[in-house]
């Protein structure tokens, strides 16, 4: 390996953020990117190091990375995080937190470069095989993939770890050794330390053959994407929900493929075959009068008006009152529901000087809303407006004193209607 396998056709810009742990792989990656920058002066290069706090050596690793980056004149961002147990297991949780930090650190126009290589690709394929994955899972990693509104590049994916080590030794590079990499209790370490050496002794080109299989799986998955694009368009609504009526006419295999692609579009974790079956049997085919719900981590799949919805789980707020002492400034809502603000220009009257302002999530009695004759209870209004059940006690209701003025994005009451041109609008940033 004498040059970086990255070329300008892979770049959406000339700005690169390199993931830099200080280990062998990322050290070789950063070294090659520094050489790339020397040959292309218009390239700007930064590095990011994640301090997980999992090792007693984590602080010394930060100092090592700072020294390397200072020597190579690469600006370094160090992100420190504390990992709480979220039920995913430490490997998955650390990876999730790491990539979340990458996404938050990327600047506009910047791409992320990571140091996965051919042996990593082989491990990823075998782990997916262990889980019983289909073509999508067995596609493993691509050299380029969408990430956080930009690109994630893996410019070393065709190189073996042995080749990377030869490069590092030849160029006198120094790297750290993470002691956790020697713990074969972790699945990936078990493959790297025990299984793959045995397989490669028998079949030296095993990783390359696995990479070819992963590429073929990826090609098959892209072909399925093309063939199912029309079906997917017919099934998905403007709100991103999935219409059930077309799915009812499909074969089990075709329907499962559509469900997987819809969930991928919603950035949901890829479901197992059993999970897909539960979605169909327990949610899609539930009784007409049921309100089925299936939890997936901090999200849910629900059915409403013959559509499937992928939503974030939020506890009902019907007993919550949020006082808005200064209504001219935005107000943060509980349970991650976002913010609301009153902005000039709209159909709501401004609060009178003696009226307190608050946000609530339930309203008693009979309500009279603008554009409708007669009064009706809030439950009836929600039904008429087609508001899904899980939004009915999480949609902000604006009160002046004890008077309901408006429901964000849904209705205005007669008592809340502006009488002049000095009205305001209730804007909800969920």
Swiss-Prot record:
CDD domains: TilS_N (cd01992)
GO cellular component: cytoplasm
GO molecular function ontology, one term from the record: ATP binding
UniProt EC number: 6.3.4.19
SMART domains: TilS_C (SM00977)
Location, primary (coarse class): cytoplasm
Cellular localization per UniProt: Cytoplasm
Function: Ligates lysine onto the cytidine present at position 34 of the AUA codon-specific tRNA(Ile) that contains the anticodon CAU, in an ATP-dependent manner. Cytidine is converted to lysidine, thus changing the amino acid specificity of the tRNA from methionine to isoleucine.
Domain comment in the entry: The N-terminal region contains the highly conserved SGGXDS motif, predicted to be a P-loop motif involved in ATP binding.
PANTHER family: TRNA(ILE)-LYSIDINE SYNTHASE-RELATED
Descriptive protein name: tRNA(Ile)-lysidine synthase
Species in which this protein is naturally found: Salmonella paratyphi A (strain ATCC 9150 / SARB42)
